[in-house]
Amino acid sequence: LYMYLKKKGYNDNELRETGLFTYDEKRGVTDKFWNRVMFPIMDANNRVIAFGGRVMGDAKPKYLNSPETKVFDKSRNLYGLNVARSSRKDYFLICEGYMDVISLHQAGFNNAVAALGTAFTQRHATLIKRYVKEVVLTFDSDEAGIKAALRAIPYLRDAGLAIKVLNMKPYKDPDEFIKALGREAYEERIKNATNFFI
């Protein structure tokens, strides 16, 4: 990618600002997302503003996002918002990751969004409030997912959003659930999601 962009006339300073490369004295310039499946991160107006990458294999970190730039602020964007904002649903499904959003969109739940590899923030809740009045939390069913949901709830409540929590068990996440049981079963879980009051 680096050589391609250099041939297209971009200089090193311009390329450094993209966040697509790493620079060090020992190895020189390397592609930051080498050997990763790439997820374009788009703003609410369908403009690509960053990338996420999932490693193939066991290397760490498993997921890697573009660094924050003038156009990309993780706390001001949600993965999938460009699709969800046009949904006919009056609520958003909030999940943890790219694959969950993609799986839900493919199953017809185009109202799914996720925070971008960061903890859910008040800014995320305020952004969601622009589009809907209710959310259904579909975070992972493991301990980390439960803790993440409990941290998100006060922000959502403070933004004035109605909150429901979807029981994912015995599955770990929406992607796994839909692959195992399908769209109709997930729709039923949404209907039976628990209202959350604090």
Named regions from a protein language model:
Residues F139-S141:
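Short glycine-centered, acidic/aromatic-flanked micro-motifs in structured strand/loop junctions
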Residues A162-I198:
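C-terminal or mid-to-C-terminal helical accessory/interaction module adjacent to the motor/catalytic core
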Residues A125-I128, P154-L156, N195:
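Flexible glycine/proline-rich, aromatic-decorated loop/lid segments
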Residues M99, F109, D158-G160, L166-M168:
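Alpha-helical interaction elements
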Residues Y131-V132, I153-Y155, A180-E187:
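Short, hinge-like loop/turn segments at secondary-structure boundaries
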Residues E143-R157, I163:
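Phosphate/diphosphate-binding loops
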Residues A119-T121, A144-I146, Y171-D173:
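Short gly/pro/ser/thr-enriched loop/turn and capping motifs at secondary-structure boundaries
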Residues Y2-Y131, V135, A148-A149:
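Phosphate-handling DNA/RNA-contact segment within nucleic-acid enzymes
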